[in-house]
């Protein structure tokens, strides 16, 4: 089913491009950009710029590699960055990069066609990540993600960039928080920006940090856009991604949050804010800078103090 959907999307995009002239393609791009300024101004654009400003993701003189995977999130991020550059008060540069980890010809063409239709000047570079992780039995998705990031950092640095931008959104953040607690026995979050530990001077930023996934889907559907989903070899022959044997832990967390939301409409916001309201004085242990600390370290010093 997934393979069929991807091919269907490719055919849809190809047919649209073949049956329209350059002016019509320009009009589609203009409509997509207008939707960010009008219909989705509050839910997408304002939350995009809110994250940019709140977490200081973009600074004067930055050269940012906007990483496009081919999905809805990264293409939306690219359009938001183009809009930001048009209106921002200080100069910064953008490079739109696509890593081909071994896409099928159909999936690669979907990405190229979408980039052309949306007027995004992508630069594609090759890697063999899919082949490298195909025979890995334990955590191939985790290994693939780590290898992808390394290749993206490396290529971005070759282009003179000091930052890479990834398309993780608000829902990714709250799901990561719960996954860490329920499956990893740890309290942590997906950070809005990080310094690279392996590529000196490089940073990773997540500009869609405060944008909801449902709003991204609404933007996609409103503009009748078609993007690839997961295009790796592991899902090429998958007939369903919702059965009990194949669904991911992240999908389980999505369903858990949806269930909790039925009785508590604020549950998503509460999860998001929980990592902003951590009281270290109430933790048994915590790690900082790789060093583990215990409440016992300072317990006797607090003797006689008010609780």
Task: Please annotate each region the language model reported.
Residues 1-15:
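Single conserved hydrophobic/aromatic residue that forms the stacking wall/gate
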Residues 17-187, 191, 195, 214-222, ...:
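ATP-dependent adenylation/nucleotidyltransferase module used to activate substrates
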Residues 41, 45, 108, 149, ...:
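A structural signal for well-ordered alpha-helical scaffolds and beta->alpha junctions
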Residues 225-307:
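The feature marks non-catalytic terminal segments
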